Swiss-Prot record:
Keyword Acetylation carried by entry: yes
GO aspect biological process, one term: fatty acid metabolic process
Gene (UniProt): Acsf2
Residues where ATP binds: T263, S264, G265, T266, T267, G268, N269, P270, K271, D493, R508, K599
Natural source organism: Mus musculus (Mouse)
Lineage, uppermost ranks: Eukaryota, Metazoa, Chordata, Craniata, Vertebrata
Location of N6-succinyllysine modifications: K182, K478, K544, K570, K599
Subcellular location: Mitochondrion
Family: Belongs to the ATP-dependent AMP-binding enzyme family.
Protein's name in the database: Medium-chain acyl-CoA ligase ACSF2, mitochondrial
PANTHER family noted in UniProt: ACYL-COA SYNTHETASE (PTHR43201), MEDIUM-CHAIN ACYL-COA LIGASE ACSF2, MITOCHONDRIAL (PTHR43201:SF5)
Top-level taxon of the source organism: Eukaryota
Length: 615
C-alpha cells in the first residue's frame, strides 16, 4: 500500500519553511516552479522508523520511534529510578571522595529540595548555581527540579560584570557557590556587585544592583551574609518540611520551566534559553535509548564526565541521562583535566566517556596515555563543536571506543537533535553528526530564498519538535527572530543532508567567509589541514580585506616538536583545494580562545588575528 504521509507532511513544511514570508508566497507561485511535484508516494517498505530517510530528494527529515514522549518531571524520573535500582551506584565524585547509590541520592535530593523551600524559595523562583563540577552542583540541579525552582546555570568562569548581567537578566532570587576554586574567588566577586552582602542578614540581602537577589548560599564555608548549604539540607530533613515538599509537588507540571541555560557566548552576549521538564526529560530519555542504555547492565553503564555541568552536554547528556537510565555518573575532576579523565576510566572501569573535540585532543596527547587501561571503555559522546574526521578515527582506534557517537545539538534544543547510532561505521561517524533524533524534524533551507535545498547542498539547518526551548528569558523579540510562528528553530548552522539522512555541519552562517563573492566554509578547510602530517589542529576565520571583502586566515597548531612554514602549508594546498580557498594568511598558534565548555570563540579569534596582522 502506498504511504502518502511524507507528501502531506512535506507540503505543510514547505509552507512553514518560508518563515516571515508566510504561506501565501508559496501558494501564489506558478505550479511548474514548485518543488512539491518532486515528492512521490512512499511505499511502505521505504518508511523506516529506525533510520528515516529524507523525503522527495530534498533536505527534510522526520525522526520516528516506537516509544512515546513522556509527561513526567525530573523529580518523578529520579523517584522511579531510585525505586528500580535503589542499591545501584548513582553518583561518584572522585575529587570529593563521595559515593551514593540511587536510594541515598534521592534521599539527599529530597532533603535539599525541602530545605530550599524552607528558606523561602518558591516554585518559579530562579536560583543560580555558580561553580565547578561538584556534588553540590548535581544536588542543586536535581533539588531545584524537585521543588519547582528554576535552576540558572552560571558559567563558573564569570567575573563580576558577567555575573551581574545574567543575575539581572533572569531576576535570580538566590545563588549557590563555593568560596573559591583555584584563583576564582566567588564570594569576593559577588561582593563587587553586592557590597551589601558582608553586613546582610543571611537570607535577607537587599542589593541596589541586584534587587531580586535575597538569598546567598555558600557550599563549603560559613561566610558573612550567606546561608550554609549543609544547614539547608539538614533543615530539609525535618518531617514538616518534607511534607510541604510533597504537597508542593502536586502542583508541578512537566511543562514548567526547570532550567535557564545561557548560550556559550561564541557570538556576543549570552541569552538565557529556558527549558522545561518536558524538554530535558525526553531529550535525555532519547539520548540514552540511542546509546542502547536500556539493554545494558550496571557494569556497562559507568559514564565518565569531564565536561562542565553548567553546560547542556554535562547537565542533560550527563546527569539527566544517567538519572533516567540508571547509569553511574562519574565526575572525574572539578574542571576539565585529561589525566584525571583517563584515571577515572582506568580505575573506575568507565564504559562511556563524554567530551568536546578539544578535550579529546588533550586526552589523546597525555604523555602517559599508553599506560592506562582501556579494556572497560566501549563508547561515549563527542559534541560541542565540529569534530575533525581524523580525531574521530583516533579516538575509536586508540581508546577502544568502537561505540563512540558524534552528537549535534544546541542549548536551545535541550540539546541533542542529531546523533550517530553506536553501530554506525567509522566513516559514517567521521563524516557526519549522525541521524535525526526521534520526535524531531529537521530541514535545510537556502539562506537567500528560504526554500528547501536539494540533498548534499548546504543551507541553514532548522529544527522543530518537543525539544525546542520555551524561549529566551525576558527577550521575546530575540525569541521570535530565532523561533518564528512556524515553530522552526533557526540554528544559524550551515549543514547538508545526504540520501541516508546523515547530517554534516559545514560551518556557522556567521562564520562563513565571503571572499570576492565566493562562499567559503571554514569547517571544510579545517578538516583539510588535518591531513597535513605536522598539523595538530586548525581553525579558519575570515579577516577584513579592502579589495576582497574578506581574506582567509588559517590559525594552525602544530603537533608537539614539529615545525613548518607558512609557505610549506600553502604549497601543501596547491592542487588539492580550489585556488580561492588557499589562505592568504597562515598563523601558527599555541591555542585558541575557548568558552568554559570548550567551544572555540571564532569572533575573538578573528579579532586576535586582525590585531596580529595589523589589519
Amino acid at each position: 500500500m502506498a504511504v502518502y504521509h511524507g507528501m502531506l507532511r512535506f507540503g505543510r513544511l514547505c509552507i512553514a519553511s518560508l518563515g516571515a514570508r508566510g504561506p501565501r508566497t508559496l501558494l501564489s507561485r506558478p505550479r511548474p516552479n514548485s518543488k512539491l511535484q518532486s515528492v512521490r508516494a512512499l511505499s511502505s517498505g521505504m518508511v523506516n522508523c529506525t533510520n528515516p530517510l529524507p523525503i522527495g530528494g530534498l533536505s527534510y527529515i522526520q525522526g520516528h520511534t516506537d516509544s512515546h514522549l513522556v509527561n513526567t518531571t525530573v523529580g518523578e524520573c529520579l523517584d522511579a529510578t531510585a525505586q528500580r535500582f535503589p542499591d545501584r551506584e548513582a553518583l561518584v565524585i572522585l575529587h570529593e571522595n563521595i559515593r551514593l547509590n540511587f536510594a541515598q541520592l534521592k534521599e539527599e535530593v529530597d532533603k535539599a529540595a525541602s530545605g530550599l523551600l524552607s528558606i523561602g524559595l518558591r516554585k518559579g523562583d530562579r536560583l543560580g548555581m555558580w561553580g565547578p563540577n561538584s556534588y553540590a552542583w548535581v544536588l542543586i540541579q536535581l533539588a531545584t527540579a524537585q521543588a519547582g525552582i528554576i535552576l540558572v546555570s552560571v558559567n563558573p568562569a564569570y567575573q563580576s560584570s558577567e555575573l551581574e548581567y545574567v543575575l539581572r537578566k533572569v531576576g535570580c532570587k538566590g545563588i549557590v557557590f563555593p568560596k573559591q576554586f583555584k584563583t576564582q574567588q566567588y564570594y569576593d566577586i559577588l561582593k563587587q556587585v553586592c557590597p551589601e552582602l558582608e553586613k546582610a542578614q543571611p537570607g535577607a540581602l537587599k542589593s541596589e544592583r541586584l534587587p531580586d537577589l535575597t538569598t546567598v548560599i555558600s557550599v563549603d564555608a560559613p561566610l558573612p551574609g550567606t546561608l550554609l548549604l549543609d544547614d539547608i539540607v539538614a533543615a530539609g530533613g525535618k518531617e514538616q518540611n518534607l511534607a510541604q515538599l510533597r504537597y508542593n509537588q502536586r502542583f508541578l507540571s512537566c511543562y514548567d520551566p526547570i532550567n535557564i541555560q545561557f548560550t556559550s557566548g561564541t557570538t556576543g552576549n549570552p541569552k538565557g534559553a529556558t527549558l522545561s521538564h518536558h524538554n530535558i526529560v525526553n531529550n535525555s530519555m532519547l539520548i540514552g535509548q540511542r546509546l542502547k542504555m536500556p539493554t545494558k547492565t550496571a557494569e556497562e553503564l559507568r559514564l565518565v564526565l569531564p565536561s562542565p555541568l553548567y553546560h547542556c552536554l554535562g547537565s542533560v547528556g550527563g546527569t539527566m541521562v544517567s538519572m533516567m537510565h540508571g547509569a553511574t555518573l562519574l565526575l572525574s575532576s572539578p574542571s576539565f583535566n585529561g589525566k584525571k579523565a583517563l584515571e577515572a576510566i582506568s580505575r573506575e572501569k568507565g564504559t562511556l566517556l563524554y567530551g568536546t573535540p578539544t578535550m579529546f585532543v588533550d586526552i589523546l596527547n597525555q604523555p602517559d596515555f599508553s599506560s592506562y587501561d582501556f579494556t572497560s571503555i566501549r563508547g561515549g559522546v563527542i559534541a560541542g563543536s565540529p569534530a575533525p574526521p581524523e580525531l574521530i578515527r583516533a579516538i575509536i582506534n586508540k581508546m577502544n571506543m568502537k561505540e563512540l557517537v558524534v552528537v549535534y545539538g544546541t542549548t536551545e534544543n535541550s540539546p541533542v537533535t542529531f546523533m550517530n547510532f553506536p553501530e554506525d561505521t567509522l566513516e559514517q561517524k567521521a563524516g557526519s553528526v549522525g541521524r535525526i533524533m526521534p520526535h524531531t524534524e529537521a530541514q535545510i533551507v537556502n539562506v537567500e530564498t528560504g526554500e528547501l535545498t536539494n540533498l548534499n547542498v548546504p543551507g541553514e539547518l532548522y529544527i522543530r519538535g518537543y525539544c525546542v526551548m520555551q524561549g529566551y528569558w525576558g527577550e521575546p523579540q530575540k525569541t521570535f527572530e530565532t523561533v518564528g510562528q512556524d515553530k522552526w528553530y533557526r540554528t544559524g548552522d550551515i549543514a547538508l543532508m545526504d540520501e541516508q539522512g546523515f547530517c554534516k555541519i559545514v560551518g556557522r552562517s556567521k562564520d562563513m567567509i565571503i571572499r570576492g563573492g565566493e562562499n567559503i566554509y571554514p569547517a571544510e578547510l579545517e578538516d583539510f589541514f588535518l591531513k597535513h602530517p605536522q598539523v595538530q589542529e586548525a581553525q579558519v576565520v575570515g579577516v577584513k580585506d579592502e579589495r576582497m571583502g574578506e581574506e582567509i586566515c588559517a590559525c594552525i597548531r602544530l603537533k608537539s616538536g614539529e615545525t613548518t612554514t607558512a609557505e610549506e602549508i600553502k604549497a601543501f594546498c596547491k592542487g588539492k583545494i580550489s585556488h580561492f580557498k588557499i589562505p592568504r594568511y597562515i598563523v601558527f598558534v599555541e591555542g585558541y580562545p575557548l568558552t568554559i565548555s570548550g567551544k572555540i570563540q571564532k569572533f575573538k579569534l578573528r579579532e586576535q588575528m586582525e590585531q596580529h596582522l595589523k589589519l
